[in-house]
Structure formats: structure tokens, C-alpha cells
Amino acid sequence: DDKGNADPSKMGEIVSLLESIKGYDLADRMRDNFISSMQLASPEIMFSVRYLAPNTTHSMDLYYAAWTTCGVTRDLVDAFECTDGQKWGESPLTVPVNESLLATGELGDANKAERAKLFQNRDRRLYETVCHSGEADFSMDGQEGGSVTITNQMQTGFGMMKLIQPTKEMPSYSTISDADVIILRYAEVLMMIAEAENEANGPTQKVYDAVNQIRVRSGQPELPAGLTKDQMRERIRNEWRVEFVFEGHRYFQLKRWKLMDKLVNGASDPALPTYVKVFKPAFYYFPLPQSEIDKAGGVLVQDPNYK
């Protein structure tokens, strides 16, 4: 509805429809779905836009690695739990950091060492999703050697790891990228089951089973028993966030949940304090194009929130 609440009467039908989907499973690792050489065999990918070198390629490695056109905020890094399932900063596994060294995009040794502390004792998906200080560690993908320098610039000190292919050198104009772009994977089906079932009936075992499959895959503990419906909703929403980073879901989910004005408006990053996000209530809806209003001869009137 206009407050972001789900209609419980419709959720049961949605769950039944989602449970009728057969023939798919989770890949061994979340990141396996995004490595070009492993995508064709992935049991998780349901729909994707296919690429195949040398005729059909793109430049995501150049854009997201060398050029760092997709910045990563500290707020996103903090969204990933520690390995005990507790929030970073609340978990006893939290490694204290010098915030003054983190509030900058500088790539010096001291800054790098401090950022590395944020990556200790964390959900494995953080390592599969985010890199820092201009380097990426592809050893998890079976590549020998240590970290690889993939860029000489990161405005916040953090960058994308998830969609970058394993490499031994910084991507350049000659880098050919042909990883498929995923539209839908089975993990999303499980998350939709969990969200719809929780809205319909609260945190039933069906909700726990769906979410825990994804959590256990990443090495995280199962969700604690006894969560309320509201608590489960918050856990589900964070699970959506950390599992599907850079896959095009977050913006539309925050609009669907009517949380853009609460979580996005006024948001900034410590490394870029002069850049502050603005989101007005009117932005939940698209304005009528002025050209269409002009052609309608007075029949169409602009949303008053845009006036």
C-alpha cells in the first residue's frame, strides 16, 4: 500500500506460485554465479542476458574495476554481519578501527591496514562482493597469488568485487568481458518465499528454511529461533541487501517498502561528506512528462508534489 505494507491476503497465493518453481538450486558459492567460466553450469541462474567473446562482449571489468564507476559506501560494508550472525559493532568479533583513517578514500598503507580490519570475521559475502584500497583478492576463485591491483582510485576506499572477473592485472581498454548479466536466480525465489510467507503468517518454519538456505551457503549461522514478525522482516530485508548487492534490486525494494525517505534522504559517506543524497516524497512516483501535459490540452495535470 502507500505506506509500504504488504497485503497478507495475497501473499499465500504468491508463496504457492513460487513453490511451484522446480529444477533449480543454489550454487556452491554466491560468487560462482558471476564468474564467466562457471555461469553456464550454475544450477542457480534462471534468466540472464548472455554474452560470448569475441562477438558479444561488454566492459564491466574496465568500468567497475579500473574506473571504479560503481562506488561502495561504508554503510553497505557495515550491513554485512560478523561470522557469529551479529551486527558489526555489536558482535564481540568486531575488530576496532580508527575511524579517522577510514573517513577518506586515500589508498595509503595506513588506510589499507585499517580497512582490512573491517574485513575480519565477516560474512563471506562481504569478501565476494566488496574489495578495498584499490586491490582485489581472487585467491577465493582458485587463482594463485595474493591481491591484485585493479584500480588506482577509490573515492570511498571501497569498490566492487562481485561483478569483476578473476584477473592477474588491472583491466584496461583491451580487456574483453563476457560474463552474463543475471536477471533472476534461485536465491531470489527463496527470498520472495520468505518475505511473502512472513507477511502472510509470520516467521513460520517455511520462512526460516528459505532464508537459512542462503545464509548457510555463505557460512553464516541460521537465524535465531523466536523472532517476531517485525524482527524477521528486518532480517529478511538485510538479507536481500547483502545477497543481491549490485543486482539492481535495492532501489526498487526501498521504494516498494516506502523507506527511501527514511534511509536514503540525507545519506552520505564519511569519505565524501559534501555529497548528500536527497529524496523527496514526490520521488516515489514518476512525474508526468511536460510534453504529454502540453499535448493533453488541459486534461492532464501535473502531480502537485512536483510543482
Residue ranges and their predicted role:
Residues 25, 29-31, 143-145:
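Aromatic-rich beta-strand patches that line glycan-recognition/binding surfaces
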